[in-house]
Regions:
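Histidine-acidic metal/acid-base catalytic patches
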Residues: 26, 52-53, 74-199
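Active-site acidic/histidine proton-transfer and metal-coordination neighborhood
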Residues: 1-94
Length: 199
């Protein structure tokens, strides 16, 4: 989504190498960042141009191009849902991340449940992210720096209700990541299994 056309085309070319690598490894998708500059509508236009070209290349290799909510306007699930609809190609979709609806640059918290629902309409992967548990609130998880708190069970129910049947990635971003990452991932996996069993 670079505003400079030459730089945008160079970015498309660089991403083609990742598409090639993904195809070689037998992957179904690569994740890209919806990064750009300008107004919301300007970014939508620039991203549509660059990613459409990447999708046309990746389609020949059977690779999907997925957007993850990951900073800037992309932290808004409604923006990514509109972007995928605008590109309107079968190998372009979304990868909703449960925890990435907070834009640290602008300190904006986008609606996470509504954003997840919007992205799930054309989701091709899901990142089941959790932080640290909230005491006495089952399945609630809270980031240790940002004001992000959410109901992990509700997020999982949104995925179930959407009819999504693809892959889940499990991600943990709690406090003292280096020390606690494995335990955090295993706890998140346990939550998922409990929620599935009770649904």
């Amino acid at each position: 989504g670079d505003p400079d056309k030459k730089a945008r085309m160079e970015s498309v070319k660089l991403h083609q190498a990742w598409v090639d690598a993904a195809a070689e490894m037998g992957c179904h998708s690569i994740r890209v960042n919806a990064s750009s500059a300008g107004s919301r509508e300007e970014q939508l236009k620039l991203l549509t141009d660059g990613v459409t070209q990447l999708c046309e290349y990746s389609e020949k290799l059977g690779i999907n191009i997925l957007f993850e909510n990951h900073g800037g306007f992309s932290s808004d699930g409604a923006f990514l849902a509109k972007l995928v609809d605008t590109i309107n190609l079968p190998n372009c979709g979304n990868l909703p991340d449960f925890g990435n609806f907070y834009n640290r640059t602008t300190e904006t918290q986008y609606p996470m449940y509504e954003g997840t629902e919007a992205m799930l309409e054309k989701a091709m992967a899901v990142s089941a992210k959790a932080y640290d548990p909230v005491p006495n609130k089952p399945y609630y998880t809270q980031h240790y720096i940002t004001p992000v708190v959410f109901d992990f069970r509700k997020m999982m129910h949104l995925v179930f209700e959407s009819g999504y049947t693809g892959y889940y990635g499990i991600e943990y971003e709690g406090e003292n990541l280096e020390k606690n990452e494995k335990a955090g991932i295993l706890r998140t996996k346990k939550w998922m299994e409990e929620i599935w069993a009770a649904y």
